[in-house]
Amino acid sequence: MLAFAARTVVKPLGLLKPSSLMKVSGRFKAHQDALPRLPVPPLQQSLDYYLKALQPIVSEEEWAHTKQLVDEFQTSGGVGERLQKGLERRAKKMENWLSEWWLKTAYLQFRQPVVIYSSPGVILPKQDFVDLQGQLRFAAKLIEGVLDFKSMIDNETLPVEFLGGQPLCMNQYYQILSSCRVPGPKQDSVVNFLKSKRPPTHITVVHNYQFFELDVYHSDGTPLTSDQIFVQLEKIWNSSLQSNKEPVGILTSNHRNTWAKAYNNLIKDKVNRESVNSIQKSIFTVCLDKQVPRVSDDVYRNHVAGQMLHGGGSKFNSGNRWFDKTLQFIVAEDGSCGMVYEHAAAEGPPIVALVDHVMEYTKKPELVRSPMVPLPMPKKLRFNITPEIKNDIEKAKQNLSIMIQDLDIMMLTFHHFGKDFPKSEKLSPDAFIQVALQLAYYRIYGQACATYESASLRMFHLGRTDTIRSASIDSLAFVKGMGDSTVPEQQKVELLRKAVQAHRAYTDRAIRGEAFDRHLLGLKLQAIEDLVSMPDIFMDTSYAIAMHFNLSTSQVPAKTDCVMFFGPVVPDGYGICYNPMEAHINFSVSAYNSCAETNAARMAHYLEKALLDMRTLLQNHPRAKL
């Protein structure tokens, strides 16, 4: 069970005005308290939607068997009704009946490494510096931009986001700074110091696998300027010219149980414990990377994506990370930059809103040179490495190397059109892209598959995500019709429009809390909590097929010309993320090399062809002008 690619369909914030210095106390709480609570959908409604979603992905025999199980489950006075009542009681007692369960199930109890399997990476536009000065100047400006965004969070002046005219829960913005995941033997935890009595005033900077604590506020509480931060980054760079022989950070890339053991080992030592505490408490991390290995232009972006997602291995930049840290910004010597974030705290949109703000901020000219004041030397974080820890580091290096070699990742910039074309056809760009994904997959494999697209539940207090299931009866009818020469072109157009509209309708239901995936998960977890034997519908082949997402997808729109990416959630699947810009679309496609049936470049090729064929179909049969 993976971080379920929980990434969402939300309008980006746009550039926020430089933050007001006036603190608006209580505004955040008042806004949050006014949000509706997440409803528990009616049982029969969810089960009907479940049966409908199974039709394109399971055989007729399997479907008929599941229909029987569903009927038994929802008999009057039966187990389904009992579990539903339990969920409804839970919903009355809690601020959000799902959020705590979801955090545990999707993230904290997930035992695979966070690297590749859970934490998304982001590629930002390549910067035009090519030397150390440029790298440090840009990093300093980026840090100043994040602190500017942070002041809006601190002062509660962050503009509220809206979706379909409804205000959204802003809680995730309060989770992404000064927070960190902590490994545990069976379940991890997340620590957050933003609201502590003495909130942290430092960030972590990593260079040559060495960690530094850099104070970014003066004693009077004002933030350092980018000029002042630049001077501090130079000091860090000059005091870490050689790579650390023991890249402690690489331990965070391991399987969670393995890392939990190594972590307990590591923090037995007081010096190590203090260093780890400093990293966990820091506002965020900045990784000053070596340049990405030189490769031809067409694969350069794929290499950069790897650097952002996993660091490229122990010979490159993987030791320059603390993967448990919620936010890590990465700036390399050659101008490539981006970030990786730990997924437990938030979905993509709050991260992208921060990125949009920061990238816009980095373009602002320095109007005044700030006065040079004497600043203390940034503190180097020391680690005492025992033979046992050294051995743990070696094992982590080997495991990471295997994971990296298995990842097949491809960046695609689709130049032919952007969201402008579907909009001109009065079609939702997101739904249009999702139907193209269905067409691409069907053309390769000759069948539909369980497809996950993340839907935001942020209309509700503490809402995270639910699932939009893109493989539908209507999408299957379209992709079959598209390959059938006996189907008239005009009918193909109608099938396409119907498939896009069906996806749009599912999306609208999902963001209103009426999708069935989280509801079924809730019923399953309620059964575990009530210690009743697991109902048959959850032990059924159809349920296993429905939860095996061969396509795990997400739209993460941004104003910045960037794209997010993540690994597939199943061994024989794809991870696909996209940012539809006005006249082009940024895609990322990932697969695993260990699966002979999947190939990221092939999927990207078929996706491009599907989008072009759908455009041609619509252009050849224009809608009648009303």
UniProtKB/Swiss-Prot annotation:
PROSITE patterns: ACYLTRANSF_C_1, ACYLTRANSF_C_2. Its EC number is 2.3.1.137, 2.3.1.7. CoA binds at K419, K423, S424, E425, K426, L427, S428, P429, D430, S456, R504, Q555. One of its GO terms (cellular component) is mitochondrion. GO terms for molecular function: acyl-CoA oxidase activity; carnitine O-acetyltransferase activity; carnitine O-octanoyltransferase activity. GO terms for biological process: carnitine metabolic process, CoA-linked; fatty acid beta-oxidation using acyl-CoA oxidase; medium-chain fatty acid metabolic process; short-chain fatty acid metabolic process. It is found in: Endoplasmic reticulum; Peroxisome; Mitochondrion inner membrane. The modification N6-acetyllysine is found at K261, K268. Gene3D superfamilies: Chloramphenicol acetyltransferase-like domain (3.30.559.10), Choline/Carnitine o-acyltransferase, domain 2 (3.30.559.70). (R)-carnitine binds at Y452, S454, T465. The modification N6-succinyllysine is found at K93, K261. A motif (Microbody targeting signal) lies at residues 624-626. It comes from the Eukaryota. It is a peripheral membrane protein. SUPFAM superfamilies: CoA-dependent acyltransferases. Keywords: Acetylation, Acyltransferase, Endoplasmic reticulum, Fatty acid metabolism, Lipid metabolism, Membrane, Mitochondrion, Mitochondrion inner membrane, Peroxisome, Transferase, Transport. Its main location: endoplasmic reticulum. InterPro entries: Carn_acyl_trans, CAT-like_dom_sf, Cho/carn_acyl_trans, Cho/carn_acyl_trans_2. It catalyses: (R)-carnitine + acetyl-CoA = O-acetyl-(R)-carnitine + CoA; propanoyl-CoA + (R)-carnitine = O-propanoyl-(R)-carnitine + CoA; butanoyl-CoA + (R)-carnitine = O-butanoyl-(R)-carnitine + CoA; hexanoyl-CoA + (R)-carnitine = O-hexanoyl-(R)-carnitine + CoA. The active site is at H343 (proton acceptor). Catalyzes the reversible transfer of acyl groups from carnitine to coenzyme A (CoA) and regulates the acyl-CoA/CoA ratio. Also plays a crucial role in the transport of fatty acids for beta-oxidation. Responsible for the synthesis of short- and branched-chain acylcarnitines. Active towards some branched-chain amino acid oxidation pathway (BCAAO) intermediates. Trans-2-enoyl-CoAs and 2-methylacyl-CoAs are poor substrates. Belongs to the carnitine/choline acetyltransferase family. Monomer. This is Carnitine O-acetyltransferase. It comes from Mus musculus (Mouse). The lineage of its organism: Eukaryota, Metazoa, Chordata, Craniata, Vertebrata. The gene is Crat.
